[in-house]
Amino acid sequence: MIAFAYYRLPYLHHATYVAQHEGEPEVLSSVVELNGKEGFVIAPFAPSGECPVVLMHPDESKLISAEGAENASRRGTSYVATQQNLRRDVAKSTSGRNFEAYAREFECFHQQLFEGKFSKIVLARKLRIQSPWLPLDSVQTSKVEDTDKPSDVQNTANTSVVQDADSLKALFLKTCRMYPRLFVALVYTPQSGLWLMATPEILLKGELNQMVTMSLAGTQKAEPSKTVADYPVEGVEWSEKNREEQQYVTDYIEDCIKVFSDDYQKKGPYTTMAANLYHLRTDIAFRLHDTGRLGDVLDALYPTPAVCGIPKDEARRFILQHEEQPRRYYSGFVGPISQEGKTHLYVSLRCMNILDDGSCELYAGGGLLRESEMEKEWKETEAKMQTILSVL
């Protein structure tokens, strides 16, 4: 089974397709091991044996138009039926066990803030739905039995879904059309499975030693009447909680960069818009002393407080122990990496994992401070999930 990725950088009218046909993608236990390496990487929130850092070494690469037509063949009976299932699944997410589980976790996480264990911590959740783009009847008829494949679950996951290449490409192109200002990627490796994302957050990008990262924290629903843009959006009021959250992330990233550079500039914070949400954003550009240490830089930056917490290591351990649903590759990062060429790595937000039966697991989270309110935080995760739900 090949590993492949479609990805489209913000504002571009073309996308890139990369694939590795020969051999297996490189499996790494830590992002530090990316030092001196090139390829296309997908990294989890916390590397482990089950969810390693995976580095593709593409032997095929080509540009494709990101403005293709929608695949109309899915608009049949099964599409209508799964649209009804989608509405049912989303309705279930706002009541019953999903909400109750989130409320329990919120109380657990929130208590740690009052006890002074963390100054900020991020709580995430997951929603599972049946996708109208990959209906079960289509997926099941495309299954290929391969007795030579190992029985390991991670290596066989998504093999049937990936057979439906036309639907997957159409799903990617639709996401590109809906979100021209976001980084859009559809990535499959035997180790990670199949992921689709439309994310606004740069982890690290640049060429040679000129690098850029960002602090993206603070969220509220956007007004439809406002101009959709990445440049500063005027007239948006922010609560003290959101401004404090943004400053935590900015301070953390600035401290990380000082280890690798003594030449950096900040711009912000300012209001930006991503899909249906406003965010507070600060851009940080810096000159990297040693381009062979991209893995070290990534290890210092990620996961940022925007998706983890402060202090980072303690917050990540707490999240791994107390979130009921493992994040897997949500809130990790993805994109092409090069020591001498161009690097474009984005945080894996507004994403979903497409499973072997055609169902999808959507992820979203929000940063908690002492003054956070459970109902507001729940609604924030609902709004963030809407980015990918709108594609479906």
Describe these PLM feature segments.
Residues Y11, H21-S142, K149-V162, D166-S167, ...:
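Non-catalytic accessory segments adjacent to catalytic cores
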Residues F40-I42, K120-V122, L186, V212, ...:
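A structural signal for short, well-ordered beta-strand segments and their strand-loop junctions
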Residues K62-E100, E105-F106, K126-S142, M214-Q321:
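Contiguous alpha-helical scaffold segments within structured protein domains
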Residues A103, Q111-K117, R177-Y179, Y188-S192, ...:
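Secondary-structure boundary elements
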Residues S119-A124, A185-T189, G295, K312, ...:
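Short coil/turn segments at secondary-structure boundaries
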